[in-house]
Each structure stands twice: as C-alpha cells, then as structure tokens.
Swiss-Prot record:
Protein name: Hyaluronidase-5
Keywords of the record: Cell membrane, Cytoplasmic vesicle, Disulfide bond, Glycoprotein, Glycosidase, GPI-anchor, Hydrolase, Lipoprotein, Membrane, Secreted, Signal
Disulfide bonds: 60-351, 223-237, 376-387, 381-435, 437-443
pH dependence (UniProt free text): Optimum pH is 5-7.
Main subcellular location of this protein, as a coarse class: membrane
Any one Gene Ontology molecular-function term assigned to this protein's record: hyalurononglucosaminidase activity
Family label: Belongs to the glycosyl hydrolase 56 family.
Keyword match Methyltransferase: no
Region forming the signal peptide: 1-35
KO phenotype (gene knockout): No visible phenotype. Viable and fertile.
Active site: 147 (proton donor)
Membrane topology field: Lipid-anchor; GPI-anchor
Amino acid sequence: MRVLYFKHSFFRSLLKSNGLPQTLLVFLLIPCYLTVDFRAPPLIPDVPFLWAWNAPTESCFTRFNQPLDLGLFSLVGSPRKSATGQPVTIFYSDRLGLYPYIDDSQLIFNGGLPQLVSLKSHLEVAKTDILHYMPIDNVGLAVIDWEEWRPTWARNWKPKDIYRNKSIELVQQQNILLNFTEAVKWAKEEFEEAARHFMEETLRLGKSLRPNHLWGFYLFPDCYNNKFQVADYKGECPDIEKHRNDALFWIWEESTALYPSIYLKSSLKSSPQAALYVRNRVQEAIRVSKVKDPRNPLPIFVYFRIVFTDLTYQYLYEDDLVNTIGETIALGTSGMVMWGTLSLSQTMKSCLDLHDYLKTILNPYIINVTLAAKMCSQTLCQNQGVCSRKDWNSNDYLHLNPQNFQIHFVKHGKYEIRGNPTLENLLYFSQKFRCSCFAHLNCQERADIESVSTVSVCTLEDICINSLVISDKSELPKDWNRPYFVNSNQSDITSSATVSPCVPRKDVSGYLVVLSLYSQHLKYSL
C-alpha cells in the first residue's frame, strides 16, 4: 500500500404541501444567487469534467504486457491510422477527404491550395473516410487536425507564406493585367473564401453523418500569445488575434466543440509564465465559445500533453500540472484531451515509466482536481453547473485542502480518500469561485454555504468523498492521516519525507511511501 500525501506547500502545494411539490418547496427555501454565466452541458451525464486519452499507448499491453491505469479517463482512443471506431477520432490531413497542401519539400497534394481542390470530390472522399473511421455513431469527439495552412490570410506567416505566394501567383497567371497590390487583394479574397467553404462544408458533412460526435478543429481557437521572451510577459492574447478570431465566426457557428491546445515547451517548466500562457488561451476559447449563443456556449475540450513538446521523454510534474490542468479546470471548461506520440510506448522502459507516472503523479492529481471541482459544483451549483473563477486572471485553484485530505494508494492498484471537508473549504469555493450554469438549466448559485452538511462526490472509479462537513479540521480523528500497511512485513517512510516525483519502479508496489510534492507558487490557500 502507498499513501500519496499532497502537502499544503503543493496544493498551497495539494488538493406535497400547499399544492406544491416538496422538492420545489425545498429548493425555494435554499438561499440562492441568480447566475448569469453559462457553460455547455456535459457530454456524458454526471461527468461535468471529461477526461479523454488520445495517445497510441495500446502497445504497452499488446507488445509488452504492461497495462496502464486509464480508468479515470471516460474516453480512451488511439490516433493510429489503423484505429477505427474510437471514442476520440482525430482526422489528420491524410485521413479526411482531399486536403490540399504543400509539404516541406514543396510537393503539391490535391492542388496545394483550397482554391484549386474540387470541393465536390473532397466531400465524396471525406464521406467514405468518416464512415470508415466512425462505423457507429456513438457519443464521442471528432477532431479535425489540419495545420498546413490557416484560413486567415494574415496568419499564414513563414513558413506558411508559401500559400499566400502561390495564391498571388495564381491570380497573376489568370489576370495578367493586375498590378501586384490588386493581385494580393484578389488572392486574399479567393484564398479565404475557398478555405472557408472547404472547412465549413467538411464540418457540415461530419455533423450530418455522425451527429452524436462533437465536431471541431484542433487548435481552434488560437491566440498566438507565445512571445515569452518579452519583458513582463503577461500571457495576453493580442487584440489583433482576438479580432481575427471574431472574423472566424463561421467556424464557431458550424463547430459543435472547440479544441484549443496548451502544450508546453521545456522553457516554461515550473515557470509562472506557463500559467499565464495557458490561462489566456483557455479564456479566449471561453470567449469564442459564446459567439454563437452566450446562453448556450460550445463545449471546450483542451488538448494537453504530459511531456514537453521539445523534450518528449521529460514528464510534466508538480507546478507544470497545476499550470496546465489546474488552470483549465479552474476556468470551467468541459474537459481535457491528453494527446501523445509513439514515444510514450516505444519500449518496455517507456511503458514502465508511463505506468509509474500515471500511478504516482498524474492520476492522483486528476483525482484531486476532479473531486475538488465536483465538491465545489455540488456546493455552489447543486450539480447544475461548474465552478469557474470569479476573477479569471487570478491564482485561485480547485484543489483539495491538504490539511484535511489525503489520497492513499492501497491494495490492487486502488486509491482512496481520507479526511473530511471543512466549512472553511466550502467558504473558499464561495469566495473565489462562481457557479457557471449548464445551458438550458434554471441554475442558481447557493448562498447559504454554512448550511451544507454533507458532501458526496466521486470520480469514475468510485473514488469518493462521502462525508459530513466538519466545522474545523480539529474535529478529524486523531489518526485520520496515519500511514498503514498492506502487511506487517512492510515498513514506511515517514510522512515528512520528500521523494522525487520520479519514483523507482521497485517502490511502486510494496510498502507505504508518502509523496510530498512541492511547488513554489501553489495555489490553494485558506
């Protein structure tokens, strides 16, 4: 058995009468505030925050007989080209229709430009591809990942400026009397119109064939807030990029989900800039999600990675998880999609490393933030919405308080929660967060936090907090956080010990270990 103890330094550092139905009378007696902010309803009932796994890690089991604990993820799919019928389906440029592009060696595919491809032929091939990769219309995510060119002319800067240059050449060939300025204007109009029709009609086709899937484009919206070298970097999305996103209203109107990305480079490791970078990108997605209908916004599923984009064998730990996952949940999105490459599962060692990372780092943090978010939602929203920051640009996070909660890793690869919520915990939620109501629900935010007497929330694997709310942590049993063992032959490492997040595999099963995960800037304080 193993105890995962998230110390305060990590999350600050862990984490029918009178003719009326009785339920209505009870509801009317609960003091509430009207909520004016909305979020998309859950894709899966009773799963307000959805975790999806989209990495080719099945070979850990099929090749190396090393299963991975992905039980916390509602949707698990592989991005391999051979994989079909996945709950998360990602369409790359070679998997959906006749996507026009020019590769790095300047080879031209399908005309190279959206102006030159036959839309009719593209849709015919795309229909076949959709039916192949989605043989059944189950509930799931449909993500189109086309990154060779951008539908906004101005965003095709180097090296994507080849699409602007080729478009200008095309206009000049067709209209030899035009001067360069006129050719650029015509080329821009033709390119953007063709790109719009190409992307719009693809979305419409997907929705018509597989309406139970949520369709959208990966990396949309983006806000290009990656100039980390600028002094006093604040992560803000440039106004010009917000205006350009506004001009892409046609994408937001046809999409049924948004899929922004918050991948980190190693230069942002344990950096406050990472939180600012992620926060502003997610907030821009929230803004865009309301373009079509502020009272019925699009769901937002944020793509993230558990490794750095430039160091694919270095996992995200401690601060980095708070700066990515913690930020995303605190802003009130619909879920996250973990994407990865073959590097996660190429060898037996990489599979063992991934197994240990899941068990000791990622899964405990997912449990932490999931239960904290659900507890806040139950307290403030009566489970009819999600909690989101009152000040979106603050450092307020949804973490379990380490002073009265512990996450234990027990026998048979299971986790359990020890401790009780305190009134102070619930008041923190009320002070720092608001209820963002699910669309189509008459949701109100609860005001009488002091009257909440119980909390009952669970993750997917029935890891639960089912307990009374205590007035103070002093009411906890004296031995509530006492380490205990799988058998009498096992010894323990004292709870004040700190060990590396990268726990050796020999320590993953066996005697109790207390993980004290530290952070300089965390992010739960009462």
